[in-house]
């Protein structure tokens, strides 16, 4: 079983542990798979029922109809991490909008250079130029949102 716990913060794992424990009424160390939807709902995590069922099937390796805590974390992480990606994209869009003062859908590379310098004041002028060259892949002298996202997320 590939362990994706490292995608979660200790706080998120603690919240999952509490939720898991409160549904593990017999304290057997496992919960019925049909309770997963209730737990996600209580945690305010949006999910698609069909995707959830497919993931339960994938994660419940022994097909017992019950999930041990580690299986539950593996499953819940898929929903929690996805939500974080959406939140991060929204934050990056807001940050981009702040620098795109004219609302043209792009920012000048000179502006991006200032941002990078603020993020890491150890960068030399040459390193900054190399980074800008990589980010502004089409050589337009501007960076659009997709190029900005790619730079910030590495995706």
From Swiss-Prot:
InterPro entries from the UniProt entry: CALM/Myosin/TropC-like, EF-hand-dom_pair, EF_Hand_1_Ca_BS, EF_hand_dom
Residues at which Ca(2+) 1 binds: 60, 62, 64, 66, 71
Positions annotated to bind Ca(2+) 2: 136, 138, 140, 142, 147
Keyword field contains Transferase: no
Domain of life: Eukaryota
SMART domains in the record: EFh
Tissue expression notes: Accumulates almost exclusively in larval muscles.
Gene3D superfamilies, per database record: EF-hand
Ranges for domain EF-hand: 11-46, 47-82, 87-122, 123-155
Pfam families hit by this protein: EF-hand_7
GO molecular function, one term: calcium ion binding
GO-annotated cellular components: centrosome; cytoplasm
Keyword terms: Calcium, Metal-binding, Muscle protein, Repeat
Similarity comment: Belongs to the troponin C family.
Name of the protein: Troponin C, isoform 2
Species this protein is from: Drosophila melanogaster
Lineage, opening ranks: Eukaryota, Metazoa, Ecdysozoa, Arthropoda, Hexapoda
């Amino acid at each position: 079983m590939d362990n994706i716990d490292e995608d979660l913060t200790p706080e998120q794992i603690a919240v999952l542990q509490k939720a898991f424990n409160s549904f593990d009424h017999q304290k057997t160390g496992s919960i019925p798979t049909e309770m997963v939807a209730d737990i996600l709902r209580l945690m305010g995590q949006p999910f698609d029922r069909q995707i959830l069922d497919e993931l339960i099937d994938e994660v419940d390796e022994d097909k017992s109809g019950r999930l041990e805590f580690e299986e539950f974390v593996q499953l819940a992480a898929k929903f929690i991490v996805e939500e974080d990606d959406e939140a991060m994209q929204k934050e990056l869009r807001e940050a981009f909008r702040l620098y795109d003062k004219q609302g043209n859908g792009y920012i000048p590379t000179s502006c991006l250079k200032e941002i990078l310098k603020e993020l890491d004041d150890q960068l030399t002028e040459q390193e900054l130029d190399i980074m800008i060259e990589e980010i502004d892949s089409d050589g337009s002298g501007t960076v659009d949102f997709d190029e900005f996202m790619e730079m910030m997320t590495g995706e």
